[in-house]
Amino acid sequence: MQIAKNNEYRTTTDQKPVLNYVADEVELETDKNADTVIIPYSDYNTVKYIYDEETKEYTRYSRGEKQVDWDTDTTVTTKNIIITFAQNYNLNDGSGKGRQGLDNIGKLEGYYITNGKAIEITCEKTSRTAQTVYKDLQGNEIKVNDGKTFIQICPINAKVTIEGENKTTEE
């Protein structure tokens, strides 16, 4: 904060936060367990998340190996995963780099995943410059657990897998 003050940077904004983070722990009311999440982007690039019940975070894997932060050399983890499905297409920009465009204006479908559970959501964006709003299927803006969040935008036909064990407790 001191660096911001020294450089006369703004420390407040009139913009609404992108996600509705809440301090109280969000426990999704659903039977859909999400211990493993697999997102195939192509034949050679699949992202996988595995839930750790002790830390209540997901470890991220890319191309079959734990993803490691280059700067800190620590394993990449996240508290929340938001998956949205959007129509994608090749940009013919002459670069030859395989860049993709996304049709993300309107209402999209997806999932919110946290604490080993998943719910279906919608994502609404009214214009290119508008903020995306994430809602549950009842139309309420979702409450997101405090912590890191990965937003995964997937091709509309991606075969995302969300798996979980139906755990039972014995007394």
Question: How should these model regions be labeled?
Answer:
Residues 1-171:
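A surface/extracellular/periplasmic glyco- and lipid-processing/surface-interacting theme
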